[in-house]
Amino acid sequence: MARTLAELPKGSRITDYISLGVVAKTFPVSTVKTVLEATGRNSRRQRDLPAHVVVYYVIALALYMQSSYREVLRCLLEGVQWLLNPTDRIKVTGKSGISQARTRLGAEPIKKLHDQVVRPIAVEATRGAWYRAWLLVSLDGSTLDVADERANEEAFGRPGASRGQSAYPQIRFVSLVENGTHVLFGTQVAGRRTGELALAKGTLPWLKPGMLCLADRYFFGFEFWQQARATGADLLWRVKKNLQMACEKRLADGSYLSHIYPSQYDRQPQRNGVAVRVIEYQLDGVAGAEPLYRLLTTILDPELAPAPELAALYHERWEIETSLDELKTHLRGARIVLRSKTPELVQQEFYGLMMAHFAIRGLMHEAALKADEDPDRLSFVHAVRVIRRKLPIFPAIPPRGDSDVSR
């Protein structure tokens, strides 16, 4: 397992490495305290680490995964005095004390804060976020390695390998991504033994009318299609080429209308069918391209969304691959595992990681709007460095409504 740094370079301060104001602006102290109260995790007595400080600590852990627990806390406490009562004297506790504080907090309030705050952020002026009147979102999933502890293995499982088992247990997660901003939202996480489709069903409450959701062929099934369609969002999903699709009406743009059915039993008498539009195309001259691509969409009128545009649009789905790469590589750095040693704290750390990614993407979106640029043209790695770099102290001053943070 990769070693963590015992300490940051000499002379380091929190303002050299993190602008807590960016995180606190995204996750205001008042919201954090409301969530803690709702989940019964607010500090009832004076502790070395108040619960709301631990929340920010969990997010900071995601930004500094190569630093030790104690070093992240030391630096954090240098920069969060406005979170504390002026008379508080919070000491930099050891690894055991930090673990106890995180265990008291648990995963529930972190997930609740994530679910309450993390959502699409694109506005009308956001470049690359829209196709005609639709907000573009994609659905996909991935896995992350977690610490090689028996409790984690029992809770999450580990993948097989050509020579025995994989070195690390893994969690699986499925997320929606806002294509234009790369914000991951509606994220669901479980052990590796849980399939992507089961997790994907948990993302559906975040699909809304006015969205166009793109997804790969492995998510398609009649039941899940109907559940996603019921959200009011429009769908553009790839399906396997062996799916039987009858051309019932050829349209001027080359696409055609057809029906999908709950089962083969319903297909023969054409019973309980649902109308779809089918787009089929090839990628000539593209290395590694498959012989045929087939897409289904809920948008039946070709004038609203012509087939050539939808075919090109589908490949926007790979925006989520960029977001997953940011999460797994650029934000985590060289570390190969989430370091928490119990299943509860793994989930806590995971949602802290998701919130750190959201805070960075929010900062990048603001910068893109000011520069009138597509957020894709900005560097995620550079944004991480900006948040870690020394910034003026005033961004860390809480908004007027959060002036009672010492209580």
Where are these regions (language model features)?
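A short, well-structured juxtamembrane/interface segment
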Residues: 118-126
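Single, function-defining residue in the core of a domain
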Residues: 1-69, 75, 103-105, 112-116, ...
